[in-house]
Amino acid sequence: MKPSERRKARRLAVQAIYSWQLSGNNIADVEHEFLTEQNVDGVDIAYFRELLGGVATKKSQLDELITPFLVRPMDEVDPVEKAIVRLAAYELTFRKDVPYKVAINEAIELAKAFGAEDGHKFVNGILDKLVARTK
């Protein structure tokens, strides 16, 4: 598997997590929608499924890890940034094969692509604190 396949899986997963957060739809329906309606060429489908399903099933646990580092309530965090931080927190917590620097860098790049103007700074700050606490 190429790193670019995982990068594409993360990119698709963040979009799917965002959609799931806003719609409240069943995660299986969101997964099906993204796999059938999006371009999945070069995407590590298994990794996409793991990230999406993992964030959905571990949402409460991930939010407990993230919340101490927020300066505002979780429900006030930008939905794009929330999706990115949840995805990265999942990787940092449950995918020990992914180096923490890779998980953080990928999250920053996703925030630059999808987030608000300074969203990447917010994401970086939260994840740096999370890594420092869990190392």
UniProtKB/Swiss-Prot annotation:
Family as reported in the entry's similarity comment? Belongs to the NusB family.
Q: What InterPro entries does the record point to?
A: NusB-like_sf (IPR035926), NusB_fam (IPR011605), NusB_RsmB_TIM44 (IPR006027)
GO biological process assignments: DNA-templated transcription termination; transcription antitermination
Q: What is this protein called?
A: Transcription antitermination protein NusB
Instruction: Report the domain of life of the source organism.
Output: Bacteria
Write the record's keywords in alphabetical order, separated by commas.
Answer: RNA-binding, Transcription, Transcription antitermination, Transcription regulation
| HAMAP family in the cross-refs | NusB
Select a single GO molecular function from the record's annotations and give it. RNA binding
Free-text function comment from the UniProt entry? Involved in transcription antitermination. Required for transcription of ribosomal RNA (rRNA) genes. Binds specifically to the boxA antiterminator sequence of the ribosomal RNA (rrn) operons.
- What is the source species? Shewanella piezotolerans (strain WP3 / JCM 13877)
The record's Gene Ontology cellular component field reads: cytosol
